[in-house]
Design a protein with these regions (language model features):
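C-terminal capping/lid region of NAD(P)-dependent oxidoreductase domains
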Residues: 6, 120, 147-151, 331-336
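C-terminal helix-rich "cap/oligomerization" subdomain common to oxidoreductases
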Residues: 1-5, 71-73, 301-336
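Basic phosphate/pyrophosphate-binding loop/patch that engages nucleotide-derived ligands
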Residues: 113-121, 135-150, 249, 253
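Predominantly a Rossmann-like dinucleotide-binding segment in NAD(P)-dependent oxidoreductases
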Residues: 128-204, 208-211, 336
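Active-site loop of classical SDR/Rossmann-like NAD(P)-dependent oxidoreductases
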Residues: 39-42, 286-300, 314
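Contiguous beta-strand/loop segments that form the cofactor/metal-binding neighborhood of enzyme cores
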Residues: 189-262, 292, 296-310
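N-terminal Rossmann-like dinucleotide-binding module
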Residues: 1-51
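Beta-loop-alpha module in the N-terminal Rossmann-like domain of NAD(P)-dependent dehydrogenases
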Residues: 51-114
Length: 336
């Protein structure tokens, strides 16, 4: 792990489905992609064809054994994320691991222990932090435009599709859970990014519509040590795809709607609320973000993690905390 900071990392992508393809496109021609790896040889080959000089393989051990590979992007089913990340960091490879990073927090703690031993940098793939509206919200919050934060509300959902309850996400052995560990973790991560950790976790997960052994809706009330609250709902019975995040401070609020595509145009509306104007809000400031660059920006951040030797954010600590929240909600659903 002692390569020069200015050296260009060389990558491999493990998992060549929809997200793996997004990751390859986000890499672009630089940094170099040496391998695509997937249990489906045809899928690995198809993705390798999009990156000149890339080799398709079906055995991840070949990737980990190649000393030229600096970093791996792991975008498999949830059940394979932590085992592959653990093998990667033990081999001295940096890793960008797609959310949620593991089936549970225990798996992710093992990755963290190994990363501390080898010095590998591990970033969790929560690309929503890199959406334009989220970055603008972060800028406004950090500048004090909202004053001290009080609470936030988040809703995220889709309506599934025919046969959704027979896909891998409906199998807890492969997914670790349902809608909470799928889209819900994005909400938990964003809430933690703005408010901090949540020692108080309340809520429940339930299955209302889909014929599956995992949840299709989750409702969360999370509180920081200072009492700031995150009120979250994740759903795959949201018949019209929806993303909404509202952040409230003492002197203003932000509303983020949409993520682009089927979730509608991505827009941030900032409502200043000076104390002297209480009850008479000033005209809002509206910012629109027609282009999603989140995947590319997240990849750039990961490359900088490696080059600068900095701790990724979100990294393993944030990923573990998010999964601890998930586990506490699932325990409540089971009467624990």
């Amino acid at each position: 792990m002692n390569r020069a900071e200015t050296e260009q990392p060389q990558f491999a992508v493990i998992g060549c489905g929809l997200i793996g393809r997004k990751r390859v496109l986000a890499l672009g021609p630089n940094p170099p992609l040496l391998y695509t790896c997937d249990l489906d040889a045809a899928r690995a080959s198809a993705l390798a064809a999009e990156a000149p000089g890339c080799t398709a393989v079906t055995d991840a051990a070949r990737v980990f054994a190649d000393p030229r590979v600096t970093a791996v992007i792991i975008s498999t089913l949830n059940a394979s994320l932590a085992p592959l990340a653990l093998a990667a960091v033990r081999a001295g490879k940096h890793a960008l691991v797609e959310k949620p990073g593991a089936l549970n927090a225990t798996e992710l703690r093992a990755v963290a222990d190994a990363a501390r031993s080898t010095g590998a940098k591990v970033r969790l793939g929560y690309n929503h932090r890199f959406h334009g509206a989220m970055l603008k919200a972060r800028e406004l919050v950090d500048a004090g435009a909202l004053g001290p934060l009080m609470f936030l509300r988040g809703r995220y959902g889709h309506g599934g599709r025919k046969g959704y309850d027979r896909e891998w996400r409906a199998d807890p052995a492969l997914s670790g859970g349902g809608e909470l560990i799928d889209q819900g973790v994005h909400l938990i991560d964003l809430a933690g990014w703005f408010l901090g950790e949540f020692p108080t976790v309340e809520g429940h997960a339930a299955t209302y519509f889909w014929d599956m052994a995992v949840d299709d809706n989750a409702f969360l009330s999370l509180r920081t040590a200072d009492g700031q609250t995150a009120w979250l709902h994740a759903s795959c019975t949201e018949w019209k795809n929806l993303f909404s995040l509202e952040i409230y401070g003492r002197t203003g609020k932000i509303i983020i709607d949409g993520l682009g595509g089927s979730y509608g145009p991505e827009r941030l509306t900032y409502y200043p609320m000076p104390v002297e104007m209480l009850g008479k809000p000033t005209p809002p400031q509206i910012h629109e973000f027609p282009t999603d660059r989140s995947w590319a920006l997240e990849t750039e951040a990961f490359v900088d993690d490696i080059r600068l030797g900095r701790d990724p954010s979100p990294g393993l600590a944030e990923g573990i905390h998010t999964l601890e929240v998930v586990e506490r909600i699932y325990a409540r659903a089971k009467g624990g």
